[in-house]
């Protein structure tokens, strides 16, 4: 249970990352499921992980790779973010998002579709973007960044018709990655090296609009976080850039969760909230940022 609240927490000295590592490992070990994570101090250089090179299902977290690929193609003049995409009835898929409920024939820019893909994790919008850029290009972009385990397998809810890797798709679902690779992708975004400083800044601004506050950020108030979540029956994932006293990338993956209830306070979501809180307390928040102590 989250109780006490700490405002503007500032460590008296350099963050004790060894202690934080032990704390996160203890939380992960007590969880009824498989937990992998990676933490990176972008500015200070400290980094540590648990199951960091193990492959995990991403659920909707893989949409970050789609966003990066889209902006990379725009950066190189192969598409424009203002290019129109038209919503057809055949494009609509269920799950998260709003486009499913809007009228067929609606036209929006690919930029707006990508915004919905991140802010609302809109599945239909994601497929519109993937139609524009192709799944194969996401693999090529991830390879160019050295992220060879980070893959989009198929369009959302259309595995049977669009899978580019049938066996991996059946094993991991929509996408796969490792904690270290996804942490590296967010580190590159923070450093302006994923696409370009301007494009990366724009993507981080989009990621800050993420509406899902039930995982890593659930114990934080007035703390800037650029992140993306993912959820499936036995999967919860969240990865993002935390703007603390230093910029910190935090990625947590849970799989094979015993508690598969679709409620706010299921075990993996509570776990991830505690892990996010521990990181924020260790590195210290700024301004009016507060953390509810586990």
Predicted features along the sequence, with ranges:
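Bacterial N-terminal signal peptides
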Residues: 1-7
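Active-site SXXK
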Residues: 45, 57-85, 250
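Structured C-terminal helix/loop/strand segments within mature extracytoplasmic catalytic/sensor domains
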Residues: 13-24, 132-134, 184-224, 229-294
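Soluble periplasmic/extracytoplasmic beta-strand elements of cell-envelope proteins
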Residues: 36-40, 49, 65, 86, ...
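Conserved catalytic neighborhood of penicillin-recognizing serine enzymes
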Residues: 92-127, 135, 171, 175
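Acidic helix-start/capping segments at beta-turn-to-alpha-helix junctions
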Residues: 42, 81-98, 133-134, 155-160, ...
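Mid-domain, small-residue-enriched loop/turn segments at the edges of structured enzyme/sensor domains
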Residues: 106, 127-186
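Beta-lactamase-like hydrolase cores
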Residues: 10-54, 278
């Amino acid at each position: 249970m989250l109780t006490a609240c700490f405002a503007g927490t500032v460590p008296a000295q350099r963050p004790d990352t060894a202690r934080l590592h032990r704390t996160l490992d203890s939380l992960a070990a007590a969880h009824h499921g498989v937990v992998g994570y990676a933490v990176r101090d972008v500015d200070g250089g400290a980094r540590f992980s648990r199951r960091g090179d193990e492959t995990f299902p991403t659920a909707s977290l893989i949409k970050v790779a789609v966003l990066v690929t889209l902006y990379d193609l725009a950066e190189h003049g192969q598409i424009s973010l203002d290019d129109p995409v038209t919503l057809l009835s055949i494009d609509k898929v269920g799950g998260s998002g709003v486009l499913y409920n809007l009228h067929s024939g609606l036209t929006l820019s690919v930029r707006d579709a990508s915004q919905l893909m991140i802010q609302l994790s809109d599945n239909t919008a994601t497929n519109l973007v993937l139609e524009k850029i192709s799944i194969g290009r996401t693999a090529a972009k991830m390879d160019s960044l050295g992220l060879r385990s980070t893959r989009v397998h198929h369009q959302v809810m259309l595995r049977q018709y669009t899978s580019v890797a049938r066996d991996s798709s059946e094993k991991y679902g929509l996408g796969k990655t490792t904690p270290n690779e996804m942490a590296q992708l967010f580190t590159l975004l923070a450093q302006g090296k994923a696409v370009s400083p301007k494009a990366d800044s724009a993507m981080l601004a989009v990621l800050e609009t993420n509406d899902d506050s039930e995982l890593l950020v659930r114990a934080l108030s007035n703390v800037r976080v650029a992140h993306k979540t993912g959820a499936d029956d036995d999967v919860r994932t969240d990865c993002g850039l935390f703007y603390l006293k230093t910029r910190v990338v935090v990625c947590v993956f849970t799989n094979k969760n015993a508690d598969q209830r679709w409620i706010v306070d299921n075990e993996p979501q509570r776990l991830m909230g505690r892990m996010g809180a521990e990181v924020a307390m260790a590195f210290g928040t700024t301004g009016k940022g507060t953390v509810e102590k586990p």
